[in-house]
Regions:
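Secondary-structure transition/capping motifs at alpha-helix termini
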Residues: 1, 157-158, 204-209, 246-255
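Bacterial Sec-dependent N-terminal signal peptides
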Residues: 1-26
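Short secondary-structure boundary/hinge segments and terminal tails
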Residues: 21-22, 118, 221
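Boundary/junction segments of secreted and surface-exposed precursor proteins
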Residues: 27-32
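N-terminal catalytic cores of secreted or lumenal carbohydrate-active enzymes
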Residues: 37-210, 231-234, 242
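Polysaccharide-binding and catalytic clefts of secreted carbohydrate-active enzymes
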Residues: 113, 216-239
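Aromatic-lined carbohydrate-recognition surfaces of secreted/lumenal glycan-active proteins
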Residues: 163-166, 211-217, 233, 241-259
């Protein structure tokens, strides 16, 4: 039975409405705050106009770096909540982010294994000592995350890229045998690299392409009680150069981006 973590979230919703007066357009902004402490869609003080401090000149003919995309994250908790809505309302939300009539998200992120936005702690490799990952399974994602991604894919006309990030390796691969903190044991670097490759294959079997990875979420640690694992820059360089990169190349996944 999955246990939903109750997160204390202060949500500020900005509701923007346009009003037109003849040929001059103005923008009206209303700020509403909701929090667990008691505010229930409470209006807060409106913005006051300040004096301009900067002047921005836009020149579309002069370009520099290319943006890969804009977007947000697919998480187990958000997918779980989305699944509790009616089919009609769920589709409205998906369309608001991914459809042509919506924000048209083009770059997204999801988590490998559980994260602080999961309903509980889990790993795709739960069996201790399974260094060949014979028991690897993404079954946990099939209830929530994967259906949400597929609905987004159906709504998106141009498609979007997915970056996947682990918060932690399974505890049995770590020097502290815990979900929180600790480091990946050097003797499990090769197993952890194989984990990434198997993850790509498992999602591919579900019809979902993984575009790239970040090696670790918050590799310097976050000091909190949710899933984490730590790397020094030297350790991460070693892992990517000598284990993850070669494993992906060997398995025909050399086109995957490592960020």
């Amino acid at each position: 039975m999955k246990i939903l973590k109750i997160l204390s979230i202060n949500l500020i919703a900005l509701m923007l409405t346009n009003s037109c007066v003849e040929t001059k357009k103005s923008l009206e902004v209303e700020v509403v705050e909701t929090s667990r402490s008691g505010n229930k869609l409470s209006k807060v003080e409106v913005f006051s106009e300040g004096k301009p401090t900067s002047k921005i000149n836009l020149n579309p003919d002069k370009t520099f770096q290319t943006f890969t995309g804009f977007g947000g994250s697919f998480t187990e908790s958000s997918a779980y909540l989305l699944n509790r809505l009616s089919k009609e309302n769920r589709q409205k939300i998906i369309d608001a982010y991914f459809a042509e009539s919506g924000a048209r998200y083009s770059l997204t992120r999801t988590h490998m294994n559980s994260s602080d936005f999961s309903l509980g702690q889990y790993s795709y490799a739960p069996v201790e000592g399974d260094t060949l990952l014979a028991n690897f399974s993404i079954e946990e994602d099939k209830d929530d995350i994967i259906p949400m991604i597929k609905e987004a894919m159906n709504a998106s006309k141009e498609g979007f890229k997915i970056i996947s990030s682990p918060w932690t390796a399974p505890p049995w691969m770590k020097d502290n045998n815990e979900w929180v903190g600790g480091k990946l044991k050097p003797e499990h670097y090769d197993t952890w690299a194989l984990f990434f490759s198997k993850y790509v294959d498992a999602y591919k079997a579900e019809g979902i392409d993984i575009w790239g990875f970040t090696v670790e979420n918050e590799p310097h640690g976050n000091g909190n009680n949710w899933e984490s694992m730590h790397y020094t820059p030297e350790e991460m360089t070693d892992f990517v150069s000598n284990y993850l990169g070669p494993q992906l190349e060997k398995d025909g996944k050399g086109d995957k981006i490592i960020l």
